[in-house]
Amino acid sequence: MKFEMHTKIISNEKEVRLHIEDNLFQLILDGYHLFTIQEILSLYKSNEERIGSAIVQKLEWENGKTTLNYQLVSLQSVN
């Protein structure tokens, strides 16, 4: 099973919103991934498109998958 370390979060639009008011999201990734916890990380929609910043709140490894819960702390928007 592969193991990867990351300094940014790339959602590929597969995130699920857990809590609206707290801007909490969950992302499930194949394989085992390691992220810094409770540090601000850049958040990307794809490899090229940065959409904001997030803080990892919880990280779980189970059955060859990584579950990442993060809080969106800033959003880059042109609206």
Protein language model regions, located:
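Short alpha-helix capping/helix-loop boundary micro-motifs
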Residues: 24-31
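Short, well-ordered loop/turn sites that connect or cap secondary structure elements
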Residues: 34-37
